[in-house]
Amino acid sequence: MSRLKQGLKTRQTRFALALKVALLGGVVAFSSVAHAEVILKEGITPASDASQIPASAKLRTDTVVAGISEPQGIFNPYFFVNGWDENVTNVIFSRLIDWDSQGKLVPGLAESWTVSPDNKVYTIKLRPGLTFSDGSPLTAEDVAFTLTVLLDPSYDGDTDITLANIAGGADYKAGKADSVSGLKVIDPLTLQVTTTQPGATTLAKIGGPVLSKAWYGKGYQRGNLDYLRSLHGKPLGNGPYVYDKYIPGQEIRFHANSHFYRGTPPTPRFIYRVTNPSTNFQLFQTGETDYDAFTSRPDDIEQLKMLGFANINLYGSSDYSQVEFNVHRPALQDKRVRQDRKSVV
């Protein structure tokens, strides 16, 4: 379960919301409100004077507002191109198989699963009574449809489902088959996935968010995902919140999903407010946002502490960077040139 969705599902973990908002190392700050003691155990420096909370934040009892950099509006978990769009999809969609705080795979939409002795066949059982946010049923057909989309030759997102080695997946992608032989719907709650070889990451690969076949798959034909792409700004999911509206440059609005399989979130409304380094402190200071991320410069940290009401979490970056050489360029075909540039980097 992502920290963002966990924070939205239960009031006692509401502070965890901000930890998902920032994708880079730095400082996350949030207003001090009820049940802080639960989250402070996770290492967050508590507010020094909670009485200093801005009046506007105190009055906002039914809405959580989190700062976010401006997304591109691609609100589909398999097509987003930046982390800010991903943050949006994280509150709209739920995973089939989730992770706990220790990185262990745990049930999500799937109630349970079994693996054959040869580690090639996965039988996944869905929780009974699952629905999408519009109340339509979520079944094994939707899971099979989702995996089929990821194997479509026109799919150009970042999820590489080929690493799961689903039987028949390569043939479907190459146009040699009309369906994926390794995907078998046993009944509305059961999907069997057959692979060609064991894989340590197979469950994680096939256990992602589930798309509604009825919503995203209207008229679906292999090799054409145009209709699905046309719905990037009209997402239908099964997560804790339902997408309402995106006002470019301003905010993304959501309301609690009454059909959420873990129960309706206690906070009725959620807003992602678009902020940037030149506006985020002022918006937080005046109570217009409850959570946001800041750089970890000493002056910034001190400024946040002086507010009194800010709970602060200083954390390191989990990002990485890499440099690759285009060896098709003649100048870089010389190993010595590459070594020289590497030493400079």
Residue ranges and their predicted role:
Residues 65, 139-148, 188-194, 239-240, ...:
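Alpha-helical secondary-structure segments
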Residues 229-232, 256-303, 331:
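Ligand-site clamp/hinge motif
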Residues 111-159, 192, 283, 331-333:
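Aromatic- and charge-enriched surface segment that lines or borders ligand/interaction sites
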Residues 46-52, 65-117, 234-237:
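N-terminal lobe/hinge region of extracytoplasmic solute-binding protein
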Residues 301-314:
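Ligand-binding "clamshell"
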Residues 197-265, 269, 279:
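Gly/Pro-rich hinge or "lid" segments in bacterial periplasmic/extracellular proteins
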Residues 61-70, 111, 121-124, 143-146, ...:
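Short, well-ordered beta-strand elements
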Residues 144, 158-219:
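Surface-exposed binding/hinge segments that line
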